[in-house]
Amino acid sequence: MKRKKHLVKITAATVICLTVFLAVLFGNAHISAESYSVSLQNLGGPVRIVLLSDLHGKSFGRENSRLIAKIQEQTPDAIFLDGDMIDRSADPTDVQELLRLIKRLHEIAPVYFAPGNHELEYMQTDTSLLTQVAEAGAVVVN
């Protein structure tokens, strides 16, 4: 009886661990778009904004092709990158990937970049990040 209880506990723990692992694995690869309507006086008409944040260097397809396609589908008037696009421990390759993403997004709509805590920590070792972001086509909001 004791052995059967032990086997049930091990099986339950294994199922829970596997479920959590799969949720994290597939959740990190999924792109979703949420729509919100906000009414602002004196705006002069509807404006579509895409807000991206907390990618932490994650890539969605080769050169972010899936992410870029999803953003193009939204036909935005502006794109806001709201921090933590890279990790605090990013290497030059991660930064170049971010800059390529900004260049591609800039072809779709104006891009606005606000650094998050990870960018701010990264800039303690590479102070040129915001200059590079601006040169890639984003307006830096700091």
In which residue ranges do the predicted regions lie?
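N-terminal signal-anchor transmembrane helix
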Residues: 26-76, 91, 127, 138
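N-terminal membrane-anchoring alpha-helices
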Residues: 1-43
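N-terminal start-of-chain detector that recognizes signal peptides
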Residues: 8-11, 20-24, 51-53, 84-85, ...
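A generic structural signal for ordered alpha-helices
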Residues: 12-16, 49, 111
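Short amphipathic alpha-helical segments, especially helix-boundary/capping motifs
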Residues: 10-12, 42-44, 75-78, 105
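Core catalytic region of metal-dependent phosphoesterases/phosphodiesterases
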Residues: 63-142
